[in-house]
């Protein structure tokens, strides 16, 4: 996600490094001084590519720039058409499952999200190349597995799998079979980063994107309380994704959707939940609490349906906002031709300024606001699960 506007945090961070380093934490990739640093090909806009080191990646992010890391695509000799026209999907013109969704939504728990996020942010960092990042992914996998195992769905083919990468932190995919292979996807990214010293400094990542991670986990838990969904009677298959290495250039989600494209997977929609917990920026601006519906680099039909979902199932309105190129994992779905959308906690300019620092902690989040994102996620998935797409 974006760079905190308060760059003075960087000065403060540099004076607090020793306090933020875990006792047994050592810098990663401690290469010899005479070795040239590894370089990566990034894309900052359609056709705008450059080779950079990993340190240069973080410098670009500190400047507020977002990008795809497309190194793997080049190495494989394949580059997708940038934002190809997605397959035509006829999203519903109205909400059709109001009674079921509202009954399920009453079971969503702020306490569950708080408890999960408190545990998830207790890892020193969730940096994708770190030991702690692998440990946090393992903890999250166990929570997702337990959520599925505690439902009827486990008896009807639901499963949770790791999606392994060339780096240590894996992505996680929970699948709930439907009557067809047409698939509805919800995603969040599980990794975190401290933009000042990524390999050693604390990166609790409560809002970015611990909030989205636990929001969709809670939506999954409640969704599986539906016997129709759990028993595989929904029209469409449902997947929940937790991506690794979003902060490094959408690496995890690109790997997932590249594989899906090669397998000719029929992905009908993808919603990203990245930063769902901060409302104070909106209130401080004197504006009404709302969720931010992203309008750039997204699928217009899916986005329009999401507006209906927010209006029908949330207690607060939506505002339209933009986040730029490659701003979160939905962009990877779009890159491979799949309809995608993104809903964030507020107007982009009012979102948290503490992200990518040691101060992105649970105490600054609003779990009532996260509950609205959980309602929206649940409503969208349930509606689309039973829709003829």
UniProtKB/Swiss-Prot annotation:
Propeptide residues, chain positions? 20-88
EC nos: 3.4.11.-
Q: A Gene Ontology MF term for this entry?
A: metal ion binding
Give the cofactor note.
Answer: Binds 2 Zn(2+) ions per subunit.
**GO biological process: one example:** proteolysis
Subcellular location(s): the record lists:
Secreted
Q: Which residues are glycosylated?
A: 96, 119, 149, 164, 181, 233
Q: Name one GO cellular component term.
A: extracellular region
Q: Please provide an example of a Pfam family that matches this protein in its UniProt record.
A: Peptidase_M28
Q: Has the keyword Manganese been applied to this entry?
A: no
Q: Which cofactor does it need?
A: Zn(2+)
Q: Which InterPro entries match?
A: M28_fam, Peptidase_M28
Q: Which family does it belong to?
A: Belongs to the peptidase M28 family. M28E subfamily.
Q: What does this protein do?
A: Extracellular aminopeptidase that allows assimilation of proteinaceous substrates.
Q: How does it assemble?
A: Monomer.
Kindly provide the name given to this protein in its UniProt entry.
Leucine aminopeptidase 1
Gene that specifies this protein: LAP1
